[in-house]
Regions:
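Catalytic Tyr-X3-Lys loop
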Residues: 81, 89, 100-120, 145, ...
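Canonical Rossmann dinucleotide-binding motif of NAD(H)/NADP(H)-dependent dehydrogenases/reductases
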Residues: 2-33
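Residue(s) in the substrate-gating loop at a strand-loop-helix junction
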Residues: 149
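A short, exposed helix-loop element centered on a Lys and neighboring polar residues
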Residues: 122-123, 174
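Alpha-helical segment proximal to the catalytic Tyr-Lys
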Residues: 127, 178-179
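Conserved mid-core segment of classical short-chain dehydrogenase/reductases
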Residues: 90-108, 127, 131-139, 158-161
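Conserved Rossmann-fold SDR core element
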Residues: 81, 170, 180-189
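The beta1-alpha1 cofactor-binding region of Rossmann-like NAD(H)/NADP(H)-dependent oxidoreductases
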Residues: 39-40, 57-69, 104
Length: 189
């Protein structure tokens, strides 16, 4: 896919891998909507990146907010060409730690953000991407990138929740790639 002039959403876009991805896409001539919960960092990065960047504070696990967000993207940009899912959390917690056992609520929070949030974003992104035919000279409508981790295969002590979440992201990406290939949408980790 040629990046120049394309519209991308980058979750976790205010810092880390998401911010680096946004910088790279902007450098290639894309328009990028940064999605993050950290408003201060998101707005700062938007100013740094200039007119081709927009920031939106969004909880990727909120179904209604995400649906509304993609409606706004379509209204403003008329299309979507890509989604890069970088939003995630990676707290360290041992199952049998000094302060007690691993909290179930923390485990569920990690899975909710890293897995459910990724799925929530990609399903609405796929719906929008599939509405539009590939641009002239291109074979695919768009691309969805889900951030995985070596922790999916080789998790370390204290990474139980994070490793489980990344294993789930890896596991859902292949069937999604097979399904969405029919819609000319590439999905990968």
């Amino acid at each position: 896919m040629k990046i120049q002039g394309k519209v991308f959403v980058v979750t976790g876009g205010a810092s880390g891998l998401g911010a680096a991805t946004a910088r790279h896409l902007i450098g290639q001539g894309a328009k990028v909507i940064l999605v993050d919960m950290n408003q201060a960092l998101g707005e700062e990065l938007q100013r740094e990146l200039g007119e081709n960047a927009q920031f939106k504070s969004l909880d990727v696990t909120d179904e209604q907010a995400v649906q509304s967000f993609f409606q706004e993207v379509e209204a403003e940009y008329g299309q979507l060409n890509g989604l890069v899912n970088c939003a995630g959390v990676a707290p360290s917690a041992k199952v049998l730690g000094r302060d007690g056992i691993h909290e179930l609520a923390l485990f569920q929070k990690v899975l909710n953000i890293n897995v459910s949030g990724t799925f929530n974003m990609l399903r609405f992104a796929a719906q929008l991407i599939a509405k539009y035919e590939p641009q002239v000279g291109e074979e695919e409508r768009g691309v969805i990138v889900n951030t995985a981790s070596v922790a999916a295969y080789d998790g370390q002590i204290g990474q139980t929740a994070y490793a489980a979440s990344k294993g789930a992201v890896v596991s859902m990406t292949l069937p999604l790639a097979r399904e969405l290939a029919r819609e000319k949408i590439r999905v990968m980790t």
